[in-house]
Every structure is written in structure tokens, then in C-alpha cells.
Amino acid sequence: MSIFQNARFYTTVNHMKDLPATRAEVAFVGRSNAGKSSAINTLANRTRLAYVSKTPGRTQHINFFELGDECFLVDLPGYGYAEVPEAVRAHWVELLGRYLQTRQSLIGLLLIMDARHPLKELDRRMLEFFRVAGRPVHILLSKADKLSRQEQNKVLAEVKRELADYPSVSVQMFSSLKKTGVDVVEQVVKGWFDALPPQDDGMAEL
């Protein structure tokens, strides 16, 4: 059974002080409309676990989904969407930044990028930002179905080349529509959980 199959909504928060008690957490982050919520739904084999919108910027809080009793999937606000009030955008930046750099229970980051437009400036900033935390990042080049196989291979090779200086970063093609790459994501995330010390092993209840 997929490690994501038991995912269910737990809580949503808008301030660091409201974060739930610590469990092992894997967070999803990406530019607005990169396919982040669709990726979560596809991995969980659900249609409406995470809200999917054609309007960028709809994920405005940190949403927690529990896996068993000891693990969370975390859906973070999308970045790069300009059509929100400055005060709201500033709050997102602070909330996202503090969570990524200070959340001790965060064991890995799934960074979603549109395969047609990978490694935009804000994506690169996110990689540098999270580098400080010293935890692994796995990039999903989403919407791969929009590219031919030849184009996919070219994009994947180019992204890997540009990430040569990031030893803790891995990358793959992914399509929510075609369910391409689901098994690879599961293996990566399971590896993160399996690497936890036994007393914190969030896979025990999955």
C-alpha cells in the first residue's frame, strides 16, 4: 500500500504559534499554480484532499495532513503570486521562511516546479533558503505530460546539470494527470522516514 494512502486532513494554521505538536513532517512547496495541490491529491490517490484551483495563490495557510499517528504531509503556501495585498504577501513570506528554517520536525522538502518552466528565480531562492536547514530536497518537475518524451529527457538533464552543486537535491519528472513518477516519490519519502531514529520512526503506523 502507498505510504500516502492513509493521508487525511488534520489542521490548518496561519501563525507559527499554532503549529501542531511535532511529528516527522514532509512539506510540499512550489510556485503558485505549479501543480502542488494536484501532486498531493495524486500521491494520496484522492481527488479533493488538497484544494485544487485554477486561480494561483489559493493555498494561503499551512495545511497539515496526517499519515497514521506520527507523520504529517504539509502543504505550504505557493510563492510568486503577485495579485494579493502586500501585507498578505509579506505574512506568507515570513510564515514560509520561519517554518522552513526553524521547524525541527521537518525532515524533507518536495519542491514542485512546472517542467516547462523549471528553476525560475524564486525556485533558486527557495533552494538556497532551504539549504540552511541542511535537509534533503526532492524536486518534482510537474505537468510532464505537457512535454514530449524527448523534451522531458532534455529538461531533466538540464536541471540535473544546474543542480550539480546541490548534493542534497534530487529531481524527477512527474505528472498528476498521467500519474507519472508516483512510485519514485513514494520511494524517496519512505526513505526519509525510514532514516529516522527508531523512536521517531513515523512509518511505524503506516
Swiss-Prot record:
This is Probable GTP-binding protein EngB. GO terms for molecular function: GTP binding; metal ion binding. Necessary for normal cell division and for the maintenance of normal septation. The gene is engB. It comes from Chromobacterium violaceum (strain ATCC 12472 / DSM 30191 / JCM 1249 / CCUG 213 / NBRC 12614 / NCIMB 9131 / NCTC 9757 / MK). The keyword GTP-binding applies. One of its GO terms (cellular component) is cytosol. GO terms for biological process: division septum assembly. Belongs to the TRAFAC class TrmE-Era-EngA-EngB-Septin-like GTPase superfamily. EngB GTPase family. Mg(2+) binds at S37, T59. Disulfide bonds: none annotated. Its cofactor is Mg(2+). The keyword Cell division applies. Coiled coil: none annotated. Keywords: Cell cycle, Cell division, GTP-binding, Magnesium, Metal-binding, Nucleotide-binding, Septation. InterPro entries: G_ENGB_dom (IPR030393), GTP-bd (IPR006073), GTP-bd_ribosome_bio_YsxC (IPR019987), P-loop_NTPase (IPR027417). It comes from the Bacteria. Residues 22-195 form the EngB-type G domain.
